[in-house]
Amino acid sequence: MANRLNNDFQFIDVGRQDPEKKPARTRAKQFAEIYEPYKPQDAAAQAHRCLHCGNPYCEWKCPVHNYIPNWLQLVSEGNILEAAELSHRTNSLPEVCGRVCPQDRLCEGDCTLNDGFGAVTIGSVEKYITDTAFAMGWRPDMSKVTWTDKKVAIIGAGPAGLGCADILVRNGVKPVVFDKYPEIGGLLTFGIPEFKLEKTVMERRRAVFEEMGVEFCLGVEIGRDMPFEQLLEEYDAVFLGMGTYKYMEGGFPGEDLPGVHKALDYLVANVNHCLGFETDPADYVSLEGQRVVVLGGGDTAMDCNRTAIRQGAASVTCAYRRDEDNMPGSRKEVANAREEGVDFLFNRQPVAVIGEDRVEGIKVVRTRLGEPDENGRQRPEVVPGSEEVVPADAVVIAFGFQPSPAPWFETVGIELDEKGRVKAPEEGAYAFQTTNEKIFAGGDMVRGSDLVVTAVFEGRQAGEGILDYLDV
């Protein structure tokens, strides 16, 4: 270790090395995480590649602004428990973000070593820190918390709700988290497949939160099993972290044919099936032996592609309307999908699902990239006369999600914007306070469908806003 720690050129002598990955042929048959854990010496060597830049771009690109160079140094020195403590100062779910964040678009994408040497494996080290610390018996230190008589109801046990609960409980405010699902995590548990995030990770995190003092009321849907007004009466404040679940339609003919599936319904039903939760057997969709076309280019589309592979689909093709460089998801996930047998059709825009009584194919047109849109991405333009039909037995549509406001929002004075998102500005009198002063909100239902880590950040910031509101 001494020789390594004194080596200022570790980033040259030791190249970027990701954790060992299971062979594609093996993992394509398993709903299990595909990366092996880092060995301690490998994690330390990779962490020591960090240059400790005076202006750490990785830290600024991270939505929760993790103290990345600092905990990399602690790992390189073997100080895992200190690294875990530091990691949890900014992130409520570091072991989750280490697994599911698109680091190539965030921290690792801005690493100085990208130019010629390969970025530090920040995400893998982040995962290693918390997994190892928990295995060593580490738990968040709650010994200095002074408990108040305040309690806050949180609707949604996804990343935003858990981030909010984390901030509140560490400051002596009792969080009670309600969720319609039987386990915590929201789409972390019921949407993201186990080859990216094994569900034991969230089970462990639930136990940790409960030890800290967070109370969970699971299998309870507010508005169905309990009136929202009851929460307003019984709690000092309420946080909404209900996510975005509404399917974005393609708007083309044939979308209602048998054999066309909504991405989220498909993924949730598969997770329920794998975990053995009691649901309507008709909800589960097996694509075994079928020619599958997945429409979309984000991480949800990759989850659908790779799930279909594991179900034994005859073939899986992902069709996306822009080129590969413009895909919105993680490049790592695209590479994993390709290794596992997914084919890609780029610059293809769907115009109709073909079939009489069920899906027989998907009609697409070729596109070329034109002028940038309002987000700076080149718009796909249709190439005239380029229609073709891709044969298919099943089509999965993964175009993203929209907010689905609850019927009681208007009743309690929660205002929405033109896209159906809850108005809860970060820069308001209290961070993420809605138009009802007692109600706060954050995550996808405020910003629109986005990353896990941004939801964690907004939940934590809303927690700080609630503390200010309660004068704690």
From Swiss-Prot:
Residues 41-72 form the 4Fe-4S ferredoxin-type domain. One of its GO terms (molecular function) is metal ion binding. InterPro entries: DPD_II, FAD/NAD-bd_sf, FAD/NAD-binding_dom, GltD-like, Helical_ferredxn. It is an enzyme of class 1 (oxidoreductase). Its EC number is 1.4.1.13. The keyword NADP applies. It catalyses: 2 L-glutamate + NADP(+) = L-glutamine + 2-oxoglutarate + NADPH + H(+). Its cofactor is [4Fe-4S] cluster. Coiled coil: none annotated. Catalyzes the conversion of L-glutamine and 2-oxoglutarate into two molecules of L-glutamate. This is Glutamate synthase [NADPH] small chain. It comes from Halomonas elongata (strain ATCC 33173 / DSM 2581 / NBRC 15536 / NCIMB 2198 / 1H9). The gene is gltD.
